[in-house]
Structure formats: C-alpha cells, structure tokens
Amino acid sequence: MPLKSFFFSAFLVLCLSKFTQGVGTTEKEESLSPLELNILQNKFASYYANDTITVKGITIGGWLVTEPYITPSLYRNATSLAKQQNSSSNISIVDEFTLCKTLGYNTSLTLLDNHFKTWITEDDFEQIKTNGFNLVRIPIGYWAWKQNTDKNLYIDNITFNDPYVSDGLQLKYLNNALEWAQKYELNVWLDLHGAPGSQNGFDNSGERILYGDLGWLRLNNTKELTLAIWRDMFQTFLNKGDKSPVVGIQIVNEPLGGKIDVSDITEMYYEAFDLLKKNQNSSDNTTFVIHDGFQGIGHWNLELNPTYQNVSHHYFNLTGANYSSQDILVDHHHYEVFTDAQLAETQFARIENIINYGDSIHKELSFHPAVVGEWSGAITDCATWLNGVGVGARYDGSYYNTTLFTTNDKPVGTCISQNSLADWTQDYRDRVRQFIEAQLATYSSKTTGWIFWNWKTEDAVEWDYLKLKEANLFPSPFDNYTYFKADGSIEEKFSSSLSAQAFPRTTSSVLSSTTTSRKSKNAAISNKLTTSQLLPIKNMSLTWKASVCALAITIAALCASL
C-alpha cells in the first residue's frame, strides 16, 4: 500500500472510531482496537531502554500521622471514648487535631501510644525487605517536636497553640523505625507530612480544613517553627554515613500551591536548602526532597539549579554553595480518582494518562531527579473515609451530598471497592491489576523511581499493598507482569481485556448506602476545572461530530492527493 494511502486509511479509521465513540448507549464496553493497542505499545517502548529507576519504595502512612481511612477503627474508638466522656451528640472527630482536642491529653496519649506500638512493628520492616522494596517513606507531623504539651512549647522554645499530643512520643517510635530499617538494610525517606497550621487542609496533614484559609505561613510562628524543625532534622539526621538509613528528607508534603502563594512556597524551599547546606558536611549525600506543590511538571526545573543562578538568586544567594542540581529531588504524586473527569475516564484513557505522565517526568530528569512518591491502585474514590470522615464518594455522587462542593456531572456508578475483595467482580479486579502494572512499567522506566501508597490499611484494598499482593493484583516480584512484557511492551491479550469504556455509566443517580463517609485527600482542590470540563468533547451533538469528521476526511483526502 502506498504510504500516503496508508496514512489516509489510518486517519479515516481513527476518525470513524472517534465519531462512533459516545454515540448510543454508554453502557456497552468496547475492547481496544488494534490501532489503540499499537498506540500504547509504542508509547511504552519509547523510553523503556532508559532504566533510570533507583527507588522502589513503600510508605508507612497512617502510623505516626494517623489517617481515618487507613485505620478507621482508631477513629471509631476515639468517638466511642468521647461519648463515654461526654454525652453530647455534637462530637466530631475527623482528624488527629480533633481527636486530641476532643479526648484530652491522657486519653489521647494512651490511644495513640497503643496505635504507634501495634500498627507498625519490626515485622513490617522485615516484610518490606522481603517483598523487594529498597526504601521506606515515613510520614511524621510537626507536632512530634512538641516538648511540653501543657505549655504548647516546641523546639527552640517556640510557642504554638494546638491540641496535639507528643512530648517525644512520635520521635521515640521514629527512632525504632530507623533501627529496624538499618537492621534490614532499607533506606529511609523522612517526610514532614504535617506543617504548623496545615499546608494543604487535608486530614493527612493532621488538620482538615475543607473551606477556610490554611494556617501555614499565615499564622504567627508557623514559619519560625517550621524552620526550627528543619534545622533539627538536618542536625539530627545528616552526616551519619553508614550509621543511619536516612537517605532523603522531604521538607514538607503537598503544600497546596494556589491556596498558599507559590512564591512563598518557593522561598521556603530555598530557606530550607540553605539550612541543609549549613549543616551538611561535604561527604554527606542525603537528598533534599521537595514536593511539586501541585504545580505542573517542569515547574521546578530551573529552581535550586546552579546552572540557572539568574533564577535562584531572586530567592536566595546560593552562589557560594557547593551543590549540584542532582542533589535536589522533585516528588510528584499522582492519583486518578479525585475529580469527576478522572473517574469517568475509560480504562484506555486512564492508562494513556499514566504513560503520558511518565513521558513528561522523563523530560525533567536532566534538571533534577524525579520520583512518583505517591500512587495507588485506586480507580474509584470509594474507599471508606477516603475523602474524609462524613464525606462521600464522587464516584457514586454522595460526595456532593456531604460537602458544599457542587457538580454538573452525573454519578459514574455504584461503589464496590469499599467492600470485601470477595465481592469484587473479576472485571474490576482486572482493571485494578492493569492500572497497577501500567504505573509500575511506566514509573520504572521513565522516572528516578516510585513509592507506593500505602503499605497496609484496615480495609481500603486499592490503597493497601499487602492486600493487593495477596489477591494477586500487585505483581510480585514487581516486574512479574500479566499484561506487559519484560521490555515494557503490552501483551497481545491485553487487547481483549483492556476496555475502551472504564465502567458502565448509570443512567440514574444510584447511591451506595455504604459510602456516606470518605477521606479528603484532595478535597480542597477537587473543584478545579479539568481539560475535559473546559472542552466537553463527549457532549458534542451527533451533527457536530459528523461535521468535524467530514472536515477531517476532506483534509486527509487533500493530503493523499499531493
């Protein structure tokens, strides 16, 4: 076939496939076409030869910073204890801040100490090593540095009023974790997951703030206390050589650019890096980790980069500092479940998003190393309390019945992933496995590494490595793919199971009675408009689709005649 004719035919097939997409019922599932399969195969093959991965990590979230959806029993117990103390029906425990405030010092201390003692033990670290991970990310809150709860006195005699319980409790268990990591030859990445006043309003920062202003860098002493904690972290964990497993320090997790001015976040990053350099010996190679602040990939390329001093000097004079751009690692977090548009995507689109995301990160690597420091197996937001205690799921529409946020989108379907694995359909299992494999194959080939969220939960299976592995939904070893080959290309059998329609969309608003409360991982940014919302292609009329397709065919015919 002449080359021009081939391209014309391929273009026509593609146009017709797009023309028919969305016409008729949305409940019919369509398998990948050979063209779509070839697109994905080519995308994976393009970068797979560049084996850049150094990090194969796991996070032990929900431990030293508690999270309701990871251990809901802890929060149910806290509510029960509060009711015993006070018969008021007004009890609302939604995060660690309100847990400590409601229960008071003694009860909170007993409850949390037992949780720290039992949720993560030495056995977990041994299993993490056995399962093939080489790094453990340990989230910890700023309140671990509280030295006198009665006086709200922190390190460096800084006073900051909050109800958190500490007096060295979290740091004691952190030291245990470092000893276990050293014993089992695991690297550790320390992560300041909660900053004073909350840096994002998510419950995993310690304090859930769904609608109000954030306190970090706004309230008195939040900046001073943050700097004091960073200084202590650097003085404590740098320059230890082989005596310490700490290889990276993430100065703050997920500062929410937009609700916090990005220039303020950037300035804090520079001040933190200056503190690190002042406390770091020339032989120390501990990595300075920054989160992307929810800015686009590539945003931080020129920052903290000695090649671009004209950029850096606006915030800090680092001319005399001896450092390389490779000393600063950018941490990206990626989930596909915290907007309506993501939840409504087809499985093909979801996996293509992952491939494109990896491609974009790969282009960053010449500026700074970059990892996907949080990702999961979740393809819905249905896990109990994922969006917050008392908050529902976007997937079944209950999110909008339990918050002040609104949407024009219909629910995608009925939640099932919050149920026991035994109640999952085989189709749902297949999709979760495919999604996990796509991320492993992409992040292993196109980034500096990955860190899965999370090691374990009580019942949020899509976020639970141990449960996913046990159900054969997470490859073990990590490259033991079902849908991909060792070179990263896609198995042919993927074409029969990877559907072009993620899930049948319900025609009515079917709500699950079991999904009335979820965790607000990204509740504060859930209403940002996505591309599909700004350009609703799927909602085009049939006449408009036909017009567009006719125009495309005309252009293709002209090209073929040249």
Swiss-Prot record:
Tell me which InterPro entries the record gives. Answer: Glyco_hydro_5, Glyco_hydro_5_CS, Glycoside_hydrolase_SF, Glycosyl_hydrolase_5
Question: What's the name of the protein?
Answer: Glucan 1,3-beta-glucosidase 2
Q: Which residues form the signal peptide?
A: 1-22
What's the encoding gene here? EXG2
Glycosylated positions are 50, 77, 86, 90, 106, 157, 220, 281, 285, 310, 317, 322, 401, 480, 539
Q: Name one GO molecular function term.
A: glucan exo-1,3-beta-glucosidase activity
Top enzyme class of this protein? hydrolase
Origin species: Saccharomyces cerevisiae (strain ATCC 204508 / S288c)
Keywords, sorted A to Z: Cell membrane, Cell wall biogenesis/degradation, Glycoprotein, Glycosidase, GPI-anchor, Hydrolase, Lipoprotein, Membrane, Signal
